[in-house]
Structure formats: structure tokens, C-alpha cells
């Protein structure tokens, strides 16, 4: 296992370096002067000169990259031009809220999706199976923003059960988490069903039944345990996508997470904030994928020797 971990860590190093290079180039690949793009052409010369010195835009490219790497190495992602605060501080305040939303969406998707998949496999062609199939088609077909608007219209405007937007207690979390997790619920239900059908027809399950074990024990301890191995990968990738791709959900529900922070930075041309956010979110996604690989190897020892 230690060798597998070492290999995965070594593979993550060039990926993180590539992320660092892309994040650095974001500030300079845009057409025109990045300083004028942020503050406009009407700014006074003193402000323009100060910002150019802070961003080192007049230095040679290798020197700028070396300076950028040295700052990132100590956790300095720069300073937001709009909030006039360190970008790392802005991220520290907003990322826990995104993590809360992603965790709630993952919990909801896991419980509902896996449960529907198991019940569908236990009774193929039944009512639950047809319901799960229809839910899967709807969940995969509808875009996130459309699902969010439908949920707001139904539960906030029509029924008035839940608030339409904002950040607060559990009531504010339900609709964003359901919106973010709907696609995963649909996909997990179909994947769990397929994996469970294969497991229930396997030789080890027939052996367990021949020994007189009850169907509940056969399903949960034998079939489900093996069927969840491919599901782990999907859960890990979805969780990484929740953390890094919740921009639409946070915008629709006015959730004060890092996704909304990125939208505000883009709309106001805050290039250092965009650069720092992209670097942070990309690193988070790489780390989550690494943890997913380790969890998959733990669940299926065959992966370690491939």
C-alpha cells in the first residue's frame, strides 16, 4: 500500500505544477494590459504604476513566474483589487461554506442514490425500479440552473416551505444541496443498480445463499459491499466537482461560497482573485482525486498491484 501511495503522490506533483503554470498564465494570456483591464483606462497614473509594480507585469516572464512561485509557496495568493484584502483570507472565509454545501449534497446523493439503486436491483422491473429509471433520466437531462429554479418555484414561491436564497440554518441548505446533488442521485442510482445486479448473480452470493444466510445479510454484507467499489470513484469525483463546480448553484441561491466569489471576481475583472481562486480550486480537485484513488485501492486490493 505504501508503494501505491508513493506512486500516486509522484503522479500528483506534475499535475500540481501544471496547475501552477496555468494559474500564473491566466493573468497574462488575456489580450491587452491586465492592469488596465482591472482598473480601466481612466485611472490615474499613480494607481496604474502602483498596481503594475505589485503584479510585476514589467518584469521578464521567468522572473515573474519565480516571484509567483515564491509567493504561492508561503500561502500568498495575492491581494484582491475589489475587496482590498488578501485573497487567501477571502478563500478561508468562503471555502467552509462551499464545503458545507458540498458535504450536504454528497450525503443526500449517497443516501438517496445508493438506496434507490439497491432497491431497484432487488426488484428489477418493479415500481421502485421504474421510478429510479425515470428519476435518472430527469436528473441527467435537466441542467443545474433549471433544477434550482424549479425547486425555488415549487418549494419557496408556491408552497412557501423553504427560503428561496440566503445563508443560515438547515432550511437554507436544503434547496441548494438538492439542486447540487440531483444529477449525482440519478447517476448513482443507475450505477449502483448495475453493480448490484452483477454482484447478486455472482458465485459468492449464490454460495452465501446456499449456506442459509438471509437475504438481508446477503444483500448488505456480501453483494452491496462488492457493488460499492466502483461507486467510490463516482462519489469522489462528484465531491471534487461539488467543491470546484458549484458556481451556478451558489449564484442561484445567493450562497456565500467560493463559487460566488469567483463569479463576482470575473464580473468585476478582479484578475488576481480569479488567478488565486483557480489555483486553489484546481489544487483541491487534485487532492480529492488522490484521496479517491487511495480509498478505491483500500476497497479493492487488486488496484494496488496493477
Locations of the language-model features?
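Alpha-helical transmembrane segments of integral membrane proteins
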Residues: 2-3, 89-128, 144, 157, ...
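Hydrophobic alpha-helical transmembrane segments of membrane transport/permease proteins
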Residues: 15-66, 85, 156-175
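Membrane-embedded alpha-helical segments of multi-pass transporters/permeases
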Residues: 16, 20, 24-29, 145, ...
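Membrane-water interface segments at the C-terminal ends of transmembrane alpha-helices
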Residues: 23-29, 59, 70, 134-163, ...
